[in-house]
Amino acid sequence: MPQKFEQMQSAEQKHDEDETIAQAGTQIDDTVDALDAVLDDIESVLESNAEEYVGSFVQKGGE
């Protein structure tokens, strides 16, 4: 009898672990999508006017 309880408990723990892993996977996918969006924005700015963008970070004559 105690063995059955341990097996049931183990199955429940595995199910909980599977749910946690699935949730973590979803969060990772969301984070990757957000990062991709930021990188796409940066790429579009650089494609449209890279010289002006880079020039805004360059110091001029002792500034």
Swiss-Prot record:
Positions with biased composition (Polar residues): 1-11
Region (Disordered): 1-28
GO biological process: modification-dependent protein catabolic process; proteasomal protein catabolic process; protein pupylation
Notes concerning its domains: The N-terminal unstructured half of Pup provides a signal required to initiate unfolding and degradation by the proteasome but is not needed for pupylation, while the C-terminal helical half of Pup interacts with ARC to target proteins to the proteasome.
Quaternary structure and partners: Strongly interacts with the proteasome-associated ATPase ARC through a hydrophobic interface; the interacting region of Pup lies in its C-terminal half. There is one Pup binding site per ARC hexamer ring.
GO molecular function list: proteasome binding; protein tag activity
Annotated region (ARC ATPase binding), positions in chain: 19-57
UniProt-recorded name of the protein: Prokaryotic ubiquitin-like protein Pup
Matching InterPro entries: Ubiquitin-like_Pup
Gene designation: pup
Involved pathway(s): Protein degradation; proteasomal Pup-dependent pathway
Keywords: Isopeptide bond, Ubl conjugation pathway
Isoglutamyl lysine isopeptide (Glu-Lys) (interchain with K-? in acceptor proteins) crosslink site(s): E63
UniProt organism field: Bifidobacterium adolescentis (strain ATCC 15703 / DSM 20083 / NCTC 11814 / E194a)
Claim: Lipid biosynthesis is one of the keywords in the record: no
Keyword Hydrolase in annotation: no
Taxonomy of the source species: Bacteria, Bacillati, Actinomycetota, Actinomycetes, Bifidobacteriales
Job of this protein: Protein modifier that is covalently attached to lysine residues of substrate proteins, thereby targeting them for proteasomal degradation. The tagging system is termed pupylation.
Any Pfam family: Pup
